[in-house]
Amino acid sequence: MKQLYFYSHGVRCAAWHLTAATDALAGESGRPCVVMAHGFSGTKDTALLGFAEPFAAAGLDVLVFDYRGFGESEGVPRQDISIPRQRQDYHAAIAAARHLPGVDPDRIVLWGTSYAGGHVIAVAARDQRVAAVISMNPAVDGVATLAHLRRTCGTGYLVRSTVNALRDVIGSALGRPAHMVPVVGQPGSNAVIATSGSEEAWLPVAGPTWRNEVRGRHALGVAFNRPITKAGKLNCPILVQPGTDDRIAPAVAARKAARRAGYWAQLREYPTDHLDFYDGPWQQRALADQLDFLKRDLAPTQGHLYETHSA
């Protein structure tokens, strides 16, 4: 695994490059490469190697990167969630991956989880050269997410999130320091993910560069995050992997995104909550399905068919 850097809109982003351990999937133009990043505030050292290393062992190069303002990447403000910026970083990472030695520039796979599970749909819809997409526990419809959070976390959660967002925005206008909120916390707290068991599931897998805070203003952008509207524009196979017990990103929205992708989509469902995908048996099950998908759909002679499965 090598450390490398690329630039996104003039800012240096940090990444890891894992070279394929085998030529099993190599073609005349080179090897396929998976471009992957975490969701929301996640960093490349938080549970992503558990996917990246098996991909490399199976014959794919992998580029794992941090968004601007997070982890080892440069950029200010720090810990500020911006959906447009994160998608710009995906496009920049794709450009970097296409210039890696031995990589086939037309066999780039996008991998995303949570917020990034939506990003990869929007990015692939714009970049029609992308060869395949993996969208795990994806947040694809902000409107559906807010309605879902009201049911799972209560109206008080939405009120607290709105207050924190306004406090951050108004405070900044008045020259005050950024108002930060925890990413994970106990039920009833100001945390973005405040469902029971969240801290216990997330903190053990969190990497050393991850910080348990983001700017409060993130909440104002949730409703506008609707990559589901781009799903019908995909021109490549996509594996959609929702958790049926997900208390953050509703499975119903992921199913709808898969239906909109139509012919290109494979839907695999798991009886899991949002954070269960990063460690343990369901991580292994999701990974196995991803490897099967990649081996099948990166073979040029294979056809594609919309499929629905429950684990």
Where are these regions (language model features)?
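Primarily recognizes the serine-hydrolase "nucleophile elbow" in alpha/beta-hydrolase
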Residues: 92-171
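Conserved alpha/beta-hydrolase "acid-adjacent" motif
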Residues: 247-253
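The serine-hydrolase catalytic nucleophile loop
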Residues: 40-53, 67, 252
